[in-house]
Amino acid sequence: MLLPRQFYARDVLIVAKDLLNCYLVREYNGHLLIGKIVETEAYHQNDPACHAYRGKTKRNEVMFGPPGHAYVYFTYGMHYCFNVVTGAIGRAEAVLIRALEPVKGIDIIKTLRGGKSERELLSGPAKLTQGLAIDLKLNGHDLTGGKILYITKGEPVAEEDIVVTTRIGINAGKDLPYRFYLKNNKYVSKK
């Protein structure tokens, strides 16, 4: 079942947890590339690590709503990262999808990733965007439309099966417990 806009129109910390075990689906050249979401990070406008911390810009304007849209950005001059916009319109919030467990289209994902091992295919933000062919053309894409790029419902996850920890690869706000991942999942980027 496709996740509706109401799913995303909630607090970023709730959505970040609830996205775990859901499926990110990418329609690519007539094929479905699917990964189960196993790791997320939450960002909101009052968070110094958030792209919207200093206000709205051309780069981050998608974060200000409406919820349920893709926020894709280019980083380090070589990688894309994929986020899901959450919360109310006008309040910048997004969930970074950090890692996926490959489910379908694995051979195509391997080709897009240059033949990496299955464990390494989608186990990081830049890896998953490369493996699912997500780039700036999908920035602002409506994830509730059910075409090209969208998220479908997964099985709920028990609280005891979710690890809550600090985020990775940031300097500001690094002490905030805004990273969530499925316990004992081998596709998580880092434990």
UniProtKB/Swiss-Prot annotation:
Classification via CDD domains: AAG
GO molecular function: alkylbase DNA N-glycosylase activity; DNA binding
One family name in Pfam for this protein: Pur_DNA_glyco
EC number, as in UniProt: 3.2.2.-
Biological processes, Gene Ontology terms: base-excision repair
Enzyme class, spelled out: hydrolase
Gene3D superfamilies assigned: Methylpurine-DNA glycosylase (MPG)
NCBIfam families according to UniProt: 3mg, PRK00802.1-3
Family: Belongs to the DNA glycosylase MPG family.
The protein's name in its UniProt record: Putative 3-methyladenine DNA glycosylase
